[in-house]
Structure formats: structure tokens, C-alpha cells
């Protein structure tokens, strides 16, 4: 068989043979086999050209996808599958990309953690879940997370949360809110407890009284439409306790309010 034409088509080339067979090949394929118009190829060489072209095309697709940002092995595999790359050659493409360090899940984890430390607000548990969803092995994630002390980040987040809620919640509710927020963000209980203790939050009696009377008035307006006397009083007490107010403070406020 003779090559009758090689023509560029966007990112690929068409290779035409005198037996009317047409192939899509990459530039790497042309270079690798030193293909040119008029070259004679036998069936074995043609099969090798086809296989190499598939691998080369798949690798180029992977490199194109990676060029926008760092990707995990799982993400690249999914991308190749979405672009109809033969599943039999995907492992070979991935191995090639990994051998050239285009895909490196360990480096991905390190970059992901560092970015979170610099600009994020997530603790190790949430980070691990996000990375597991990207197909990274648990062993790789845990190895990198264990090397990081998340207390400084937790401290920074707790200070931001404290400033946000310090004039809106009573002391107990404030501490509970900080603890809930930190653990929801993926920090473990011990780190969360330590950084909250380090804030040295003290009770502001004047603020507490102002907050409790505002909440008491709100609950009274809401509940007095349905209940009266003893039941109204008990429901107000329960509502305020759920908001983090102390029982004795509630009783004291009620004596003056009702």
C-alpha cells in the first residue's frame, strides 16, 4: 500500500492510502514513522501506525486537558472515556503521562492542601472527602495530611467567626456556634476546642442582658398569640434555653418582663 496524501486537519492529519483507506493520525505519528507521500507500507506497519496514532491522540487529549490546571488520574481517565478513547489503551496512556510526571496524585494532594491553607477554610476531614471524590487513594491523602498542623488555620477561622457572631449570641451559644462551624468545616474536636479556648472569650453581662431581652420580646410576641400564663412562660424558657441562654438569666429577665 502506498501513502497518497497527508493533509493537516486542525489538530490532526488525514493519511490516505491507495487502497482508499483513510486514517486520522497525529503529528507525533508522522514524525515517529517518518511518514511521507509516496511511502510504501505493509499491513503490519499500517497496524503499528494505527496503534501508535491512537495512543498519541489519547496522550495529546490528556495533555490538553491537563494544560488548563492540575488533574488527578481519575479525572484524566474520565475525560479520555468521554472522548471515546478505546478503554484498552487508556491504562497505557495514563502510565505514559504518569511516567513523565504530567499526572501525579501526590503532588496534586500537596497543592490542594497548600491552597486551602493559603486561601481556604477547610479542615483535614473535609479535605480528605473532597480528594477521595477525585479518586485519590486514601493512603496518599492521609500521608500528606499527617504532615500538616491545621491549628493555625483553625485559629484564623475561629477569629473570623468570633468577630461575626460576638455581638449576636450569648456566651454559650457563641461557643457552640464556633465549635459547630469548625467541626462542620472538617477540623477535629480537639483542635476546635483548643482554638476556642485560646480566644479567651469572656461573658459580657451588659451584652447578654441586651440580647436576652431582645430574644425574650421576640418569643413573647410569637408565643403569646397561642399560649398564656404558665404554658407561655415555660415555652419562652425552653425557646431561650435552646438559643443558648442560661436558665437563671432567663428567669431573672422574665421576672422583669412579665
Swiss-Prot record:
Protein keywords: Cytoplasm
Record-linked InterPro entries: RecX_HTH_1st, RecX_HTH_2nd, RecX_HTH_3rd, Regulatory_RecX, WH-like_DNA-bd_sf
Lineage top rank: taxon: Bacteria
HAMAP family: RecX (MF_01114)
Cited function: Modulates RecA activity.
Protein's cellular compartments: Cytoplasm
Family statement drawn from the similarity comment of this UniProt entry: Belongs to the RecX family.
Annotated source species: Streptococcus agalactiae serotype III (strain NEM316)
BP term (GO), one: regulation of DNA repair
Annotated GO CC locations: cytoplasm
Name this protein carries in UniProt: Regulatory protein RecX
Amino acid at each position: 500500500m502506498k501513502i497518497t496524501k497527508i493533509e493537516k486537519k486542525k489538530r490532526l492529519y488525514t493519511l490516505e492510502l491507495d487502497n482508499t483507506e483513510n486514517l486520522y493520525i497525529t503529528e507525533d505519528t508522522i514524525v515517529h514513522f517518518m511518514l511521507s507521500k509516496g511511502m510504501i507500507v505493509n499491513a503490519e506497519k499500517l497496524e503499528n501506525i494505527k496503534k501508535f496514532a491512537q495512543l498519541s491522540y489519547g496522550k495529546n487529549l490528556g495533555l490538553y486537558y491537563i494544560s488548563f490546571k492540575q488533574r488527578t488520574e481519575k479525572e484524566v481517565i474520565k475525560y479520555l472515556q468521554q472522548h471515546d478513547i478505546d478503554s484498552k489503551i487508556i491504562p497505557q496512556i495514563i502510565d505514559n503521562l504518569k511516567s513523565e510526571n504530567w499526572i501525579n496524585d501526590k503532588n496534586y494532594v500537596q497543592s490542594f492542601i497548600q491552597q486551602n491553607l493559603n486561601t481556604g477554610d477547610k479542615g483535614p476531614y473535609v479535605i480528605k472527602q473532597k480528594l477521595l471524590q477525585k479518586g485519590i487513594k486514601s493512603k496518599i491523602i492521609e500521608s500528606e495530611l499527617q504532615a500538616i498542623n491545621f491549628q493555625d488555620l483553625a485559629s484564623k477561622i475561629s477569629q473570623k467567626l468570633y468577630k461575626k457572631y460576638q455581638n449576636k449570641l450569648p456566651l454559650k451559644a457563641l461557643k457552640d456556634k464556633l465549635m459547630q462551624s469548625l467541626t462542620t468545616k472538617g477540623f477535629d474536636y480537639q483542635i476546635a476546642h483548643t482554638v476556642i479556648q485560646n480566644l479567651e472569650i469572656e461573658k459580657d453581662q451588659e451584652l447578654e442582658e441586651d440580647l436576652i431581652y431582645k430574644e425574650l420580646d421576640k418569643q413573647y410576641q410569637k408565643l403569646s398569640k397561642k399560649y398564656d400564663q404558665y404554658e407561655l412562660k415555660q415555652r419562652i424558657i425552653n425557646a431561650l434555653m435552646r438559643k443558648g441562654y442560661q436558665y437563671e438569666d432567663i428567669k431573672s429577665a422574665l421576672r422583669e418582663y412579665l
